[in-house]
Amino acid sequence: MKKAAIITIGSELLEGLILNKNAQFLCQELKNLGYRVVKVSTVGDDLISISEEVKTLLLKVDLLILTGGLGPTQDDLTRDAVAKVLNRSLKLNEELLSKIKEKIKKYHSEIPQNIERQALVIDGAEVLDNPVGSAPGQLLTVDGKIVILLPGPPRELIPMFNALKDRLRTPDALYQVVLKYYSIPEAVLEDLLKDILYSQNIVEVATMADHVEGVRLRLTTHMKNKEYLDEMVKKILDKTGEHLYGVNDEKMEEVVVRLLKDRKKTLAVAESCTGGMLSSLVVNVPGASEVFIGGVVAYSNDLKKHILGVREDTLKKHGAVSEECVQEMTEGLKKLTGADICVSISGIAGPSGGTPEKPVGTVFIDIFEHEHITMRYNFTGDRNMIRTRSAMMALENLRKYLKGRERV
């Protein structure tokens, strides 16, 4: 198996000012491409430190990836360090400089004088286009080894690395399928599938769970076993298909927007404890404007009454966190927006506000098209976890409703 190493560059990483998301992403991707990552190191913005690390690792690995330090400032030293170690010159690429300037002009009226540094290319390097930012990457082949320079911001690095994956894939590449579930506990899912998952030794099985993506069942094998894994997935879906919301990179909100489009339904949401989180998830999906009419954040009781038409008597008798309140919220929202389907959320996110009857984490969610489908939940976790789980469960309930189930 080929070996790889990663050098993440930036003093801000060493000082703990930002998380090293690039290392996590690259380690996962390189494993799938058939590499064994033997080292991940973080180096500050220092020419000697970067150069020494590059020189050391080039003796040990087949693929070396450096991230960060490709900007225009004097402390962006990755190009200089690699050129120094390889004993190659840095040359100004005029065509590249023009492209960089054109990108910058779209967002800034003035071009920084030091921008030329981003157009310095190591002799013999292939320039890698950056579709998001201004800092291009570079790829070099050195005695059969590959050296790749990528920018530091993950939103720039990820699409640039993805564009290289076909070129980097090895004979030891892995085939992986990730199945995603939300409303079924990890232990229950594993119990349902144990005869399928653990009666074989060809596919590596891993389950992960969090409050954002729910339960993820990750199945990994070598590419030569692709057909075996595909058959295994079919058996899994025969048992758990109704609980599945997505595969691999699919997000819950993307699935919901697609289902709304397929069924030609419009959506509006009324939120209390989630404070616009549900709306934000939906509008993050490209094309959501075709189906999403809008949302109301009715945090106070006054807004619930005056905007959504929740009755004073309902609030006094049952409270804002109640089945009756969320049902009146969706009814009022339907009158207000004319949406085909309305969803409302009201709950106690904490840390205060709970009672013995309605402790912190109590959340009501209602879906209303022709009749109400109302659910009560008792979520655990801190304030942000409760709010996130509420928004995600609203999407999960809506997904099930759109898939045709009478009850969620």
Curated annotation (Swiss-Prot):
InterPro entries: CinA (IPR050101), CinA-like_C (IPR036653), CinA_C (IPR008136), CinA_KH (IPR041424), Competence-induced_CinA (IPR008135), MoaB/Mog-like_dom_sf (IPR036425), MoaB/Mog_dom (IPR001453). Pfam families: CinA, CinA_KH, MoCF_biosynth. Belongs to the CinA family. This is CinA-like protein. The lineage of its organism: Bacteria, Thermotogati, Thermotogota, Thermotogae, Thermotogales.
